[in-house]
Amino acid sequence: TKASVGFKAGVKDYKLTYYTPDYETKDTDILAAFRVTPQPGVPPEEAGAAVAAESSTGTWTTVWTDGLTSLDRYKGRCYHIEPVVGEENQYIAYVAYPLDLFEEGSVTNMFTSIVGNVFGFKALRALRLEDLRIPPAYSKTFEGPPHGIQSERDKLNKYGRPLLGCTIKPKLGLSAKNYGRACYECLRGGLDFTKDDENVNSQPFMRWRDRFLFCAEALYKAQAETGEIKGHYLNATAGTCEEMIKRAVFARELGVPIVMHDYLTGGFTANTSLAHYCRDNGLLLHIHRAMHAVIDRQKYHGMHFRVLAKALRMSGGDHIHAGTVVGKLEGEREMTLGFVDLLRDDYIEKDRSRGIFFTQDWVSMPGVIPVASGGIHVWHMPALTEIFGDDSVLQFGGGTLGHPWGNAPGAVANRVALEACVQARNEGRDLAREGNEIIREASKWSPELAAACEIWKAIKFEFEPVDKLDIKK
């Protein structure tokens, strides 16, 4: 038996066991691409092997119990290392994990292994998980999004254009009745959705049950008047899973179409539970990514948002915030389009120019609609329509409620701008080049749009993104 072979105690280099450049990856392996910045004097192979070891079966010394199992079957393997272009002493280490290391249907367990203790490892100056390849053998153990893009369109009876939303502001401090009034005005004016802000849960100035009631009243009234299906993302995020489900149950009893969750602050376990409830009860699920920038904004350490996006698609959500490219929040265009495709499409080819390290095959898992939100207004509409296409939600908070004439005219301005852009695109016009002209033409017959154009004509948020794709300098 293995255990009787004689056990050699002591510390040995990780690379002797965990660096295997000849390894051929299996179709069932979970593959990870890490950006590794070793401490001075640590060779890249040792650093890459250390990552593979610490995120799978290894520990800092040889242990007697290694003899009781088959390390070859269970260990993570660093199978390829390449230097990062334009950076000194920085490498992409590719690690393959056998599928048996992970519990089925648990994003929580997957992340505990892959991005657990290893990120505090002393031999590395910094470590960032850039991408994951999730094999169908694993993704099939997840239910994924409660409904998906096509089911959502069918439920809402809205086709051939992006959907429009609005976050109700001021996000904290309104009473439930006034909050509901703002929802009604926006929906009545032509938006498809209004939204609870991510930090609206159940505070002293507005308890959740009151808000749910007044928002439901608002959307039914707007629905009756416009003949269109309306929704309000009721934020069910709570301090405990039980309380969260209680809120979702009440939303279902009110008959509303959609609820919302903050998936990173709420946690993947809670999120997956809520997604299962939503699927079983016909509720759409809108996901906000509050806290993501803590994890994904630094280029050299943490985890890229494309990994958080893949994890959300597995855990379950029908919408997720995904940057705007043009507004006030972080997001480089090619990189953003890369993870937008990872959210929506069935099959995404490896493409390093868009930050996609692996070909990802989701097989039949439903897609997630990306939400563009944050500092956008009517002048951005042509760019947003062109960048995100029809399967998206464009959310204008200040860009609706900041209209000089009030909320309903703000909603009218956004809807007119969107319909004008969609029509122009369908007629074959170039939105990137003629965008401003299209908006100007539409504003001639829409006084609401003209007023919006006037007030935001010079607003831009021009900063270089912190997290960029690697290119030769």
Swiss-Prot record:
Top class in the EC scheme: lyase
Pfam family, one: RuBisCO_large_N
InterPro entries on file: RuBisCO, RuBisCo_large_chain_AS, RuBisCO_lsu_C, RuBisCO_lsu_C_sf, RuBisCO_lsu_fd_N, RuBisCO_lsu_N_sf, RuBisCO_lsuI
EC numbers on record: 4.1.1.39
Residues at the catalytic site: K169 (proton acceptor), H288 (proton acceptor)
Localization annotation: Plastid, Chloroplast
Required co-factors: Mg(2+)
Keywords recorded for this protein, A-Z: Calvin cycle, Carbon dioxide fixation, Chloroplast, Disulfide bond, Lyase, Magnesium, Metal-binding, Methylation, Monooxygenase, Oxidoreductase, Photorespiration, Photosynthesis, Plastid
HAMAP family membership: RuBisCO_L_type1 (MF_01338)
Other known facts: The basic functional RuBisCO is composed of a large chain homodimer in a 'head-to-tail' conformation. In form I RuBisCO this homodimer is arranged in a barrel-like tetramer with the small subunits forming a tetrameric 'cap' on each end of the 'barrel'.
Protein's UniProt name: Ribulose bisphosphate carboxylase large chain
